[in-house]
From Swiss-Prot:
Protein name: Ribosomal RNA large subunit methyltransferase E
Gene of this entry: rlmE
UniProt source species: Ehrlichia ruminantium (strain Gardel)
Active site: K79
SUPFAM superfamilies in the cross-refs: S-adenosyl-L-methionine-dependent methyltransferases (SSF53335)
Molecular function as annotated in GO: rRNA (uridine-2'-O-)-methyltransferase activity
């Protein structure tokens, strides 16, 4: 995990998200946010399929958090790698948001499968799938 410099009006929690859902629940109890942004990435092992599966797992956790804590019409942005489970995850995000688009930053290498999903218009009152 990498530390991050503080940013005004941004709450930053450095933790293992897989083991600290309760920390998030207690910290943000009943609070809702305009944006949930996930730049999480697992440590790469070099096997593209394993690396892809690991980042999709993090994406699913970040989506679950977004669905719980985001305001109606809110924004969810998450880092993703192209691969076998990408379309299924895209459909899960599309279920919860009105618009979902891929974005590849100019700083990203052209041969990299790293992208971001930018999701706008959170649909409130849908159960997490």
């Amino acid at each position: 995990m990498q530390k991050m410099s503080s940013i005004p009006n941004v709450i930053f929690i450095l933790c293992d998200i897989a083991n600290n859902i309760e920390l998030l629940n207690s910290t943000f109890d009943k609070k809702k946010f305009d944006v949930v942004l996930s730049d999480m990435a697992p440590k790469a092992c070099g096997n593209k399929q394993v690396d892809h599966a690991n980042i999709i797992n993090l994406c699913e956790m970040s989506l679950e958090i977004a669905v719980k804590f985001i305001k109606p019409n809110g924004i969810f942005i998450t880092k993703i790698l192209q691969g076998e489970y990408e379309k299924e995850f895209y459909q899960s995000v599309k279920y919860h948001f009105n618009s979902v688009k891929y974005f590849k930053p100019k700083a990203s290498r052209k041969d990299s499968s790293e992208m971001y999903l930018v999701s706008l218009g959170f649909k409130e009152n849908l159960e997490y799938i």
